[in-house]
Amino acid sequence: MTSILIFVAGAALLVYCAEKLVAGLVGVAGSLHVSVFLLAIVFTGIEFDDVALGVALNVENLGGVALGTVFGTAISMTGIVLALAAIISPTRVDIPRSYLVLFAASPLMMLPFVLTAPLTASDGVVLLFLFVAFIGYVAARELRSTTPVFRNAEILERIGAGGSAPAVDVVERPVDPPAPAFARVRAQAAPGRVGLALLALVGLIVAATVTSTGIDGILDEYSIQGTLFGATIATAALALEDIFLTVEPNRRGAPEIGVGNVIGSVVFGVTAKLGLILLTGGTIDVDDHVLSWHLPVLVLMTALSAYFVSTGHLRRRHGFLLLALYVAYWVVSFTVFGQVPIDGD
């Protein structure tokens, strides 16, 4: 029971520190002209808490759990986060198809590395490069494109800080003439924001250590298979922040922020997150369940989500279907793989 309490406390601290880190980073970027969608991908899509936890787990020789959080987070972003956003606040959304193609194809980037397992530091370098290339493509397109919709980036800042933004902050400009697809984040006191970001980063490191200690105890006490635990329970504890960062923007009339969070989180998770875990923690062995179960589910859920977004309207039926598939993933994972101990011979 003590291990469970340690895990819950660590996960809660991870989410809290991640929110503060996002707020600090957005504040530092306050004087820049940046696309709101690009901001969402970079500042909410990059999962600092997940990275901190994954690195801590791999350093402590819990590579199976670390790999499980990679798959689990990516699957939960569509099966929980996007699903709840569609159910709670159906909305129209306009995301370029090229972004959706990259989003749908992103899980397939893992396939060659999984097939040639174990995963190594050199694989991590390639995965990091793929994420940088993705961000570079999105940034280049956003900075030179035009769109009739101009959204105030202050919304992202308030949401990232744990607050809410009034609906009137979201405004539309006439199609003619088109407005540039970037917004100015209001200038903040940069030194204070930098200090906040650094403090939150330290908190993430401490929280990740506490959480990994709790996970280690749970695995020993309850004999749960490592990748399974990382892909389900540990992931669910870390999903609260993403649910807020996706549902609230939809409800406030800024769906680009929520969808950007989902797209950024999935692409980051299967590339840079795994890459950083490998570079800092070393080699990870891949069990058969990854190729036969977790990866196919991730490919299916991501492709289906990309299709729903491509229709231009996230509907409740889309959310219910994604949520049902995620529940089925949990049920099958525990009933089929749940009895395999992490150190089983």
Predicted ranges, named:
Residues 1-345:
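Hydrophobic alpha-helical segments, chiefly the membrane-spanning helices
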